[in-house]
């Protein structure tokens, strides 16, 4: 222990000359110094305020403390050398100004960190590997990729992590985007192939595809929010417009439409004059008077619709009428049938509707006329001859 401290202390004062051990004479009263006294002597030159008298008192205390131990002759020869040099260094430290004190402290500081017996000086030291780690952490947080490149391999913020964010090149991004265009989810064999092709790892490609899918999902969501209020949804149908759509309704949308409502047939008023196209059918019938009269819309009466869906006139005559393929003798109280009022029944005239129907009186078997007409049967009854609306044949 004392040899180790001697070698450490000898390194402190390498700039001083050491006298030989035979130049000193030792009496029986001289005692060896213990390690504690050497430590006290070693620590004393650090403080520049101490005087020589204080250091002599320290040596006396060292003599008292060292009387308990009897070291060997070799140890006794080596110890006084260090003590004498400490005594020589003490007046120099006390009398020299502050620059010399700083120089001695600078000489002692490297060896004091390495010595085991010195008092530990606790100071925060930053080693080069710590500096490099912090600089790398700053570069990770501050470095941004160039335009067209993305950093998808993100590292956690801890300083211990060594993972660096991946900056993909433009060629790699083109290949990855093309692959994403065809397949959003990449299978493992294709991932291995892409990794070998682009000189990347499977993990980097997998993370890139994950981030790209999230970006695509976000873009689709933003587009849906932007276009949904005015966009055409598939459950919406275009509104029905005007005369292009003729439905089965109680009212006629235009004059020439022929819509039919089963429960309630529409009431035909005077403006609807061309519903059945009476003015177009002007071909004469065989056996009829050649001078015919058309019935314009002004000669129609406003017929009231009865509850049973039949049209009737107030003044009904017993004239045979063809209704639904049958000849029916219209009676004055007949309700549920379509009647033709104010039509005289001369024996010499007949109306041929279907080439097979006959009216008693004059049996007329004429050829089929493709345009049957409702005509006035006698010219002298033209003033009071009125024609009601023709019935709709519901059995067809």
UniProtKB/Swiss-Prot annotation:
Keyword Protein biosynthesis: no
DNA-binding region positions on the chain: 161-220
Keyword Protease found: no
UniProt xrefs under InterPro entries: DUF4074 (IPR025281), HD (IPR001356), HD_metazoa (IPR020479), Homeobox_Antennapedia_CS (IPR001827), Homeobox_CS (IPR017970), Homeodomain-like_sf (IPR009057)
Signal sequence interval, chain numbering: none
Short name of any one Pfam family annotated for the protein: Homeodomain
Location relative to the cell: Nucleus
Polar residues bias: start-end ranges: 20-56, 72-85, 375-386
UniProt GO MF annotations: DNA-binding transcription factor activity, RNA polymerase II-specific; RNA polymerase II cis-regulatory region sequence-specific DNA binding
Highest taxon, organism lineage: Eukaryota
GO cellular component, one term: nucleus
Positions of region (Disordered): 18-163, 219-246, 364-396
Residue ranges of the motif Antp-type hexapeptide: 126-131
Protein's GO biological process: anterior/posterior pattern specification; embryonic skeletal system morphogenesis; regulation of transcription by RNA polymerase II
Keywords from the named record: Developmental protein, DNA-binding, Homeobox, Nucleus, Transcription, Transcription regulation
Annotated Low complexity bias: 86-104
Protein family: Belongs to the Antp homeobox family.
Protein role: Sequence-specific transcription factor which is part of a developmental regulatory system that provides cells with specific positional identities on the anterior-posterior axis.
PANTHER family, alphabetized: HOMEOBOX PROTEIN HOX-D3, PROTEIN ZERKNUELLT 1-RELATED
Protein name per UniProt: Homeobox protein Hox-D3a
Organism annotation: Danio rerio (Zebrafish)
Taxonomic lineage from the root: Eukaryota, Metazoa, Chordata, Craniata, Vertebrata
Underlying gene: hoxd3a
């Amino acid at each position: 222990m004392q040899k180790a401290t001697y070698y450490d202390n000898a390194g402190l004062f390498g700039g001083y000359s050491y006298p030989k051990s035979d130049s000193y004479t030792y009496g029986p009263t001289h005692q060896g110094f213990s390690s504690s006294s050497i430590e006290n002597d070693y620590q004393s030159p650090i403080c520049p305020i101490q005087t020589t008298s204080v250091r002599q008192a320290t040596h006396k205390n060292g003599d008292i403390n060292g009387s308990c131990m009897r070291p060997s002759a070799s140890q006794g020869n080596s110890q006084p050398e260090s003590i004498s040099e400490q005594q020589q260094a003490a007046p120099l430290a006390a009398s020299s100004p502050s620059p010399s004190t700083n120089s001695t402290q600078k000489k002692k500081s490297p060896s004091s960190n390495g010595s085991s017996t010195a008092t530990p000086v606790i100071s925060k030291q930053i080693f080069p590997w710590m500096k490099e780690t912090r600089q790398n952490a700053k570069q990770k947080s501050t470095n941004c990729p160039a335009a067209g490149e993305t950093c998808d391999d993100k590292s956690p913020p801890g300083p211990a992590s060594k993972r660096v964010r991946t900056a993909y090149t433009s060629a790699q991004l083109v290949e990855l985007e093309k692959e994403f265009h065809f397949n959003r989810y990449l299978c493992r064999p294709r991932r291995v192939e892409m990794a070998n092709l682009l000189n990347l790892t499977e993990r980097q490609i997998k993370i890139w595809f994950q981030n790209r899918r999230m970006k695509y999902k976000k873009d689709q969501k933003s587009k849906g929010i932007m276009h949904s209020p005015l966009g055409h949804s598939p459950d919406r149908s275009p509104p029905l417009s005007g005369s292009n759509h003729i439905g089965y309704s109680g009212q006629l949308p235009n004059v020439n439409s022929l819509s039919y409502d089963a429960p309630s047939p529409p009431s035909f008023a005077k403006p609807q004059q061309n519903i059945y196209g009476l003015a177009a059918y002007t071909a004469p019938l065989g056996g009829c008077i050649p001078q015919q009269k058309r019935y314009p819309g002004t000669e129609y009466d406003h017929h009231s619709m009865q509850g049973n869906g039949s049209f009737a006139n107030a003044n009904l005559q017993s004239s045979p009428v063809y209704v639904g393929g049958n000849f029916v003798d219209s009676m004055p109280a007949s309700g549920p049938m379509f009647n033709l009022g104010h039509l005289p029944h001369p024996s010499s005239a007949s109306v041929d509707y279907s080439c097979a129907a006959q009216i008693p009186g004059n049996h007329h078997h004429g050829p089929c006329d493709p345009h049957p007409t409702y005509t006035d049967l006698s010219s002298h009854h033209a003033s009071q001859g009125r024609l009601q609306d023709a019935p709709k044949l519901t059995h067809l």
